[in-house]
Amino acid sequence: MTDSQQSKPKHVMMMAAGTGGHVFPALAVAKQLQQQGCQVSWLATPTGMENRLLKDQNIPIYQIDIQGVRGNGVIRKLAAPFKILKATFSAMRYMKQLKVDAVAGFGGYVAGPGGLAARLLGIPVLIHEQNAVAGFTNAQLSRVAKVVCEAFPNTFPASEKVVTTGNPVRREITDILSPKWRYDEREQAGKPLNILIVGGSLGAKALNERLPPALKQLEVPLNIFHQCGQQQVEATQALYADAPANLTVQVLPFIEDMAKAYSEADLIICRAGALTVTEVATAGVAAVFVPLPIAVDDHQTANAKFLADVGAAKICQQSTMTPEVLNQLFTTLMNRQLLTEMAVKARQHAQPNATQHVVDLIQKM
């Protein structure tokens, strides 16, 4: 290697598109790579949310025109190979022009052509799968990638190139104090249990409609913080209107500071997206997961099982959320000692150094 090659910063192209579940972990890794002196670029789709999220991040974006190929019409399926080929050549052109040294794919439609382009150019590829069930693109790329990162164990068949890293999470979440200390402090102060309900940015209609009636049946003192989405505030508030005196309820359209919300919660009730499960484990909070029933390959149930199987969480399928089932479940959980034990188990299965672990693997390629 020449002196000029040694002095040239490593150029890493990130590939992540479509959803925050792909983009946020990739962004955490990208920022850490930049801090270590790497040059970072991003392969994106023209209309994906990654363009908005990266607007102020000082990361140049290069777009290729690609869409999904699963479950679409006949004409689109027939055209798909040509679109993939065109997108692959576009990605190859960018990679050659930028002299990319390594490619890191975090999922989304863009990663398929991008990973293929890197392979054809002899550029090493790392992929990262956020869910417990591999997405279509990552499942295909795992065959050609040099390094395969999985957030949850056994997502991919065992191999020397498969590494369980966990999901990269924000620093604010990894900095949350230990669950034992938090729960014990609330217990000693005689505080009511804090129940946090999170439905995501749009809210989860099933949680908003079915949880209030069940929670109103409980007889212990509770502080309920229910994040329901901007469009469902009035309807959700109405369901709590006749709440008994033992309940204190706050209905919120969204939560600005999730780290604070996690740290103050004794129990969280939420969906089981990959990043949510990872943040719950990292924060150390007892959880009831209600997997999204329409999730591809039922991956949210698989995500939730990561914590449920070790006693850190309960799973309640949306189809079984009757008042009787919910009342029985919540009555069992209204015990801070039990919730403390669950929260401690959750923290024990967290991987707070996931971001640096993935960065180290990229640097070694």
Swiss-Prot record:
UDP-N-acetyl-alpha-D-glucosamine binds at residues 19-21, 131, 170, 201, 255, 274-279, 300. CDD domains: GT28_MurG. InterPro entries: GlcNAc_MurG (IPR006009), Glyco_trans_28_C (IPR007235), GlycoTrans_28_N (IPR004276). Disulfide bonds: none annotated. One of its GO terms (molecular function) is UDP-N-acetyl-D-glucosamine:N-acetylmuramoyl-L-alanyl-D-glutamyl-meso-2,6-diaminopimelyl-D-alanyl-D-alanine-diphosphoundecaprenol 4-beta-N-acetylglucosaminlytransferase activity. It is found in: Cell inner membrane. It catalyses: di-trans,octa-cis-undecaprenyl diphospho-N-acetyl-alpha-D-muramoyl-L-alanyl-D-glutamyl-meso-2,6-diaminopimeloyl-D-alanyl-D-alanine + UDP-N-acetyl-alpha-D-glucosamine = di-trans,octa-cis-undecaprenyl diphospho-[N-acetyl-alpha-D-glucosaminyl-(1->4)]-N-acetyl-alpha-D-muramoyl-L-alanyl-D-glutamyl-meso-2,6-diaminopimeloyl-D-alanyl-D-alanine + UDP + H(+). It is a peripheral membrane protein. One of its GO terms (biological process) is regulation of cell shape. It comes from the Bacteria. It is an enzyme of class 2 (transferase). One of its GO terms (cellular component) is plasma membrane. Cell wall formation. Catalyzes the transfer of a GlcNAc subunit on undecaprenyl-pyrophosphoryl-MurNAc-pentapeptide (lipid intermediate I) to form undecaprenyl-pyrophosphoryl-MurNAc-(pentapeptide)GlcNAc (lipid intermediate II). Belongs to the glycosyltransferase 28 family. MurG subfamily. This is UDP-N-acetylglucosamine--N-acetylmuramyl-(pentapeptide) pyrophosphoryl-undecaprenol N-acetylglucosamine transferase. The lineage of its organism: Bacteria, Pseudomonadati, Pseudomonadota, Gammaproteobacteria, Moraxellales.
